[in-house]
Amino acid sequence: MNAPVKPSQLIKGATGDWEVVIGLEIHAQVSSNAKLFSGAATEFGGDPNSHVSLVDAAMPGMLPVINEECVKQAIRSGLGLNAQINLRSVFDRKNYFYPDLPQGYQISQYKSPIVGEGEVVVDLPDGDSTTVGIERLHLEQDAGKLLHDQDPTSTFVDLNRSGVALMEIVSKPDLRSSEQAKAYVSKLRTILRYLGTCDGDMEKGSLRADVNVSVRKPGEPYGTRCEIKNVNSIRFIGQAIEYEARRQIGVLEDGGAIVQETRLFDAGKGETRSMRSKEEAHDYRYFPDPDLLPLEFSQAYVDELKAGLPELPDQKKARFIGSFGLSPDDAGVLVSERESADFYEAVLAALADAARDGKLAANWVINELFGRLNKDGQSIEVSPVSAAQLAAIVDLIGEGTISGKIAKELFEIVWTEGGDPRVLVEARGMKQVTDLSAIEKVVDEIIAGNPDKVAQAIAKPAMLGWFVGQVMKSSGGKANPQAVNDLLKRKLGL
């Protein structure tokens, strides 16, 4: 589904150009208070084995019971990915042995997933966009966690995570660079967070990726792929792809062959290393779970969930552009995180004239607020300047009470001291001078005192800026800049 590969996306090798082919399997933890098949809590960070039911521990005779909220969250996610919702799906047993898997199998979905094909439009850093196909989304259980640092001779098992609901979102092999892959994961994370179906916290493991990488000469069939397991940051996903593509190219150019295998990414060294040979589906001996009936629901059930979906990033971006004249870049920045979009929406709601000042408000949110938050290492949720305060500053600019320069001084005062911007402007004498006679007096003084500059300005109109600067300086930055410009042009005959 993706566009033709650009020359800049090709990797130079000793034998010419190579194309990297990438597919991603995203494991997103479902936002739910209980696990997929038990009532145990999903809270992060509890004492080991403090959130484990008899079902999670695979005690004999205990049967799984589906959590309907997890089903709803999977459907919502599928709808957000423009995907086909399957009204009938089946849970299967994926059989393998590992100490953190008490049953000896994982309950997953193989042939009949809850969500079928979809697509995501991804905006890229260079301004282009690409469409990434979604192959499927299915529900499955997470495994537990092995603890190797509790004892020098023993490994312990923590089953708190065992049975937590995951959505595995499988992309088609449509990605052609590490930058595309990172942008895709960012977009997918944003969509899930808008929907409220996954918190997207990669540090806590709520979102992690298995990265499938292969290389080929342009126009040739797909090469043998390797899977890099459990990469837990967007930056590491990019690094893993870059390293693995180079590694495979090196092997092939040296006359070797790529072995299909599972690899791990060593974040400390920035490289991948072999973990085990890659399993095929038949290795897991999938079969329908006899303890669970097929999952069936009506189209009306899906339609009801669809009607309750929030406005998603692409829709919000289009509205910001159409209603407030924002550039695609600025709108993209605002919708990239749900919290920043919510803050901007709150500013719009507080403005006296959002139609007039919506674009100005966006500039202030992106340049002044985000800039200061980044400088101070703070998140927008704890911003010292509230949406209402920022809206008041924008109102003061829009109505001509203060200039942009004074507004920046006011923003700094509100950031450090707090307070109502309108009260501060009155109390500190920060109002812009709009009295034309007062401004004209200053303009006349500047012109009279600089006859040589007047001659230069008449010959070179760009010199007008010097006069504007002098008038603003004399007025303490309070003169209305537009009035100053108009008066100077009239007085100098420009």
Curated annotation (Swiss-Prot):
Gene3D superfamilies: 1.10.10.410, GatB domain, N-terminal subdomain (1.10.150.380)
Family annotation (Pfam families): GatB_N, GatB_Yqey
Top-level EC class: ligase
Alphabetic keyword roster: ATP-binding, Ligase, Nucleotide-binding, Protein biosynthesis
EC number: 6.3.5.-
One MF term in the entry's GO annotations: ATP binding
InterPro entries from the UniProt entry: Asn/Gln-tRNA_amidoTrfase_suB/E, Asn/Gln-tRNA_Trfase_suB/E_cat, Asn/Gln_amidotransferase, Asn/Gln_tRNA_amidoTrase-B-like, GatB, GatB_C_1, GatB_Yqey_C_2, Gln-tRNA_amidoTrfase_suB_CS
Catalytic activity of the protein: L-glutamyl-tRNA(Gln) + L-glutamine + ATP + H2O = L-glutaminyl-tRNA(Gln) + L-glutamate + ADP + phosphate + H(+); L-aspartyl-tRNA(Asn) + L-glutamine + ATP + H2O = L-asparaginyl-tRNA(Asn) + L-glutamate + ADP + phosphate + 2 H(+)
Keyword ATP-binding set for record: yes
GO biological process annotation, one example: glutaminyl-tRNAGln biosynthesis via transamidation
Task performed by this protein: Allows the formation of correctly charged Asn-tRNA(Asn) or Gln-tRNA(Gln) through the transamidation of misacylated Asp-tRNA(Asn) or Glu-tRNA(Gln) in organisms which lack either or both of asparaginyl-tRNA or glutaminyl-tRNA synthetases. The reaction takes place in the presence of glutamine and ATP through an activated phospho-Asp-tRNA(Asn) or phospho-Glu-tRNA(Gln).
The protein's assembly and partners: Heterotrimer of A, B and C subunits.
Family under the similarity heading: Belongs to the GatB/GatE family. GatB subfamily.
NCBIfam families to which the protein is assigned, alphabetical: gatB, PRK05477.1-2, PRK05477.1-4, PRK05477.1-5
Protein name stated in the entry: Aspartyl/glutamyl-tRNA(Asn/Gln) amidotransferase subunit B
Organism expressing this protein natively: Rhodopseudomonas palustris (strain HaA2)
Name of the gene this protein is made from: gatB
